[in-house]
Curated annotation (Swiss-Prot):
It comes from Chlamydia pneumoniae. It is an enzyme of class 1 (oxidoreductase). Binds 2 divalent metal cations per subunit. Gene3D superfamilies: Heme oxygenase-like. Its EC number is 1.3.3.-. This is 4-aminobenzoate synthase.
Length: 224
């Protein structure tokens, strides 16, 4: 019998971000620089909000060990020098986006919906739902970062400083996702795995819709 965690991993793999046309074009050097600039500006909303997702989970967690692990992830995001938000700004600037453009960017509805989805799931009474949302995202990031770095180096001439955000997350999110998986397996003994699976699917869909906003095709995922 297939376990709920195996179902979760299969669900994520079936709609992995690397299967999206936007990232496929990125890997093949078929994106226009303006598309990358638009992406860097719009995704900034999610980058800035990510520590808030973790804070919401940390504030409501009664399990001391799990709370410490969430705090470690939060510290990775907030306390580095440079921190992860600054690394993203560095990436945007390397693409020719100005500080003023980044600060004054009007975020798309797709970006706002994505952040709202993560915030709502991380505020759910069931802690496992929020952890499942972050796991769904972070388990994909190391592979995505490998392709992003390769594309940025080969096709766009971005320096190591420019893509440092992805270098950091290529390593860090292996650890974060592994810890989140362990936390999920601890919590789901007390909580409903169906709610975790549903929350994960909502994350997959909102990520897919966000990426679709940067290309002409807005068709739903047909990779299942």
């Amino acid at each position: 019998m297939t376990s709920w965690i195996e179902l979760l991993d299969k669900q994520i793999e079936d709609q992995h971000m690397l299967k999206h046309e936007f990232y496929q074009r990125w890997s093949e050097g078929k994106l226009e620089k303006q598309q990358l600039q638009a992406y860097a500006k719009d995704y900034y909303l999610h980058i800035k909000a990510f520590p808030c997702y973790l804070s919401a989970l940390h504030a409501r967690c009664d399990d001391l060990q799990i709370r410490r692990q969430i705090l470690e992830n939060l510290m990775d995001e907030e306390a580095g020098n440079p921190n992860h938000i600054d690394l993203w700004r560095q990436f945007a600037l390397s693409l020719g986006v100005s500080e003023e453009e980044l600060a004054n960017h009007e975020f798309s509805q797709a970006a706002q919906d994505m952040v709202a989805t993560f915030r709502r799931l991380c505020d759910m009474p069931q802690l496992a739902v929020g952890l499942g949302a972050l796991y769904t995202y972070e388990i994909q990031i190391p592979q995505v970062c490998v392709e992003k770095i390769r594309g940025l180096k080969e096709y766009f001439g971005v320096s190591a400083r420019g893509y440092a955000y992805f270098t950091v997350h290529q390593e860090a999110d292996i650890k974060h996702a592994s810890e989140e998986k362990e936390m999920l397996q601890t919590l789901v003994g007390r909580e409903n795995p169906d709610a975790v699976l549903q929350g994960s699917q909502e994350v997959l869909d909102t990520l897919w819709n966000f990426l679709s906003s940067f290309i002409n095709s807005t068709e739903p995922c047909s990779c299942k």
